[in-house]
Amino acid sequence: MDIVCEFCDKSFDSKSKVNAHQRTKKCQQFRTITFVCRKCSSAILGYDNILFHVENCNGTTPILHKEIEDKIKVKNHNKEHDNKIFFGKGLNGKTVYIFNYEKSMLTYGSTNIISESIVSTIDNLVEKATLKSLNDAIQSFSKESFLQEILFKYPQPFSISDISKFFEYESRTVMAFLMAKDLNDLFEILFKECKLFPVCIVNDDIYVIDKVVRQNLDKWILEWKQIDYKEVSLSLKGFFLPVLNYAIKLFLNESNNNTTLKLLELIKEIADETKIRKLMSTFTKPIPVFEDIQNIFQNVKYIYNGSYKHTPMDTFIKNISYGSCFVKEKSIKTEHELYSLLMSLTKESEKTALIKKIKMNDNDDIVEIEKEMKLLKV
């Protein structure tokens, strides 16, 4: 079965060949370019595909820049009715609206980015979890290799959405990183390398973008919403759900080892609201200062120039909020249970009892875990 490079629209017969191709300069340098043929108005991705199309296109009706811009405007006009506004540059340098914005979802559901089903995650991601597989990953691990692996899968500028997907699909890699390094290193990658608009902290209060309003062609107003850091602390846990599932399976397979106990200590740090808040303060930045910014933060608003390219902080909040991570009521309950379960495993007597009582296999349901946890009074 052919595998297609998402950047170049080019097919390969194996995943290894796709990976090798995506490391090449040709793929990396031209992956952000979309060619629009003026003969047939087709949009083509990939350097080789562009050259092939130019040589073989039989289109006879030229398309003008103005027509392309008109199409963009019509498309963006329709988008505005879905509460999405766009801003950017047309082919001749003229301003058009292609600025991507989605309303912040702090307390209500959105699309599922992190695992919707805890059971399915355990079955699919960590079926063969063993201490050996974890130790093998740790042996050649470094902060740099972790960052490079993320950058390879999600070339910069990557988003928090990319990071959350990486956590879901690469739970063993994340677990190895936590064992080899610490939360501070992990947060440094998440907050320093990811291209996003910063959280604003003023007098220990945390603000995120709640609404973006277009004032005119170049000026926009960002309305800020103050949030409780406990919400952010809870939200960050969503990243670690696949890793927690991996940890549960690892305990059931090989319970008596220092490696898994060390991981649980790290997980306890994640649940420490004071520590999370301190890390948030370390890696967040004040409101950026530019000559064209009129700072009126006292009114929880400020104006900036529309040509400044950034990813609104609402993207970050939406993708890791408990609204998106735990859409279903059952999932919310499960998240708390998983943490309680892992906390209980640090106590030797409860850990032994739990491992003895819970036998996880392909047909297990989360209800069985609930029953056993009630017996343990977790």
UniProtKB/Swiss-Prot annotation:
Q: Which domain of life is it from?
A: Viruses
User: What GO MF terms are annotated?
Assistant: zinc ion binding
Family assignment from sequence similarity: Belongs to the IIV-6 302L family.
Outline the residue ranges of the record's C2H2-type zinc fingers.
Answer: 3-25
Extract the PROSITE patterns matched here.
ZINC_FINGER_C2H2_2
UniProt keywords (A-Z) are:
Metal-binding, Zinc, Zinc-finger
Record-given protein name: Putative zinc finger protein 302L
Organism of derivation: Invertebrate iridescent virus 6 (IIV-6)
